[in-house]
A protein has these predicted regions:
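Short active-site oxyanion
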Residues: 28, 60-64, 111-113
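Short acidic-hydrophobic, aromatic-tinged amphipathic segments that line or gate anion-handling sites
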Residues: 45-48, 113-122
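Catalytic binding pocket for nucleotide-activated donors in carbohydrate/polymer assembly enzymes
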Residues: 82-117
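Residues at secondary-structure transition points
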Residues: 11, 49-59, 67, 94-98, ...
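Donor-nucleotide binding loops and adjacent catalytic segments primarily
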Residues: 1-60, 101
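C-terminal amphipathic helix plus adjacent low-complexity
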Residues: 124, 128-160
């Protein structure tokens, strides 16, 4: 099963769900879609999941596809899954700024996620993930420091 989550954000993420809809070729999909209007064909769908339900789906999944929300990414990582991350983009009206893009790029450079900025690359990323699953992420001091630095910068930008 491929688990797709748009997180608990109140904004729609139709771009991701439209790309997932194109995968609906018999692929076993569970999609947490939030307020988005698209329901991928053939997928089992839910508006929202409890934290425990989300963790269970991540543990069951062969691949996790998520927005680049820090909570969703860290939940996947803490449950031994290196997620495929599609950031919400400011220029497309999906976010108020590009914090998800910056976080996704930083997490990818640290080897924590597979970043897909253009949803045209999503099928390939999923196929590669399923053919040769990446090893579970192993936090190290550099990673912890990178995340701490990124979060400190992000909070500083919001306060400043």
């Amino acid at each position: 099963m491929i688990f797709v989550t748009v997180g608990t954000n109140e904004a729609r993420f139709d771009r991701l769900l439209a790309a997932v809809d194109e995968l609906s070729d018999g692929t076993d999909l569970f999609v947490q879609h939030g307020p988005s209007s698209i329901r991928p064909a053939g997928a089992t769908c839910a508006d929202y999941l409890s934290f425990d339900e989300m963790v269970e789906k991540m543990r069951q999944a062969r691949a996790v596809v998520t927005h680049a929300g820090v909570g969703s990414v860290l939940t996947a990582l803490l449950n031994g899954t290196r997620p495929i991350v599609v950031p919400r983009l400011q220029r497309l009206g999906e976010a108020v700024d590009d914090h998800q893009l910056h976080f996704g790029r930083r997490a990818e450079s640290a080897g924590l996620v597979t970043l897909v900025e253009d949803t045209a690359g999503l099928p390939r990323a999923i196929a590669q993930h399923q053919e040769s699953p990446p090893p579970p992420p192993r936090p190290d001091e550099r990673l912890v420091e990178d995340l701490r630095s990124f979060l400190t910068e992000a909070v500083g930008r919001k306060d400043g």
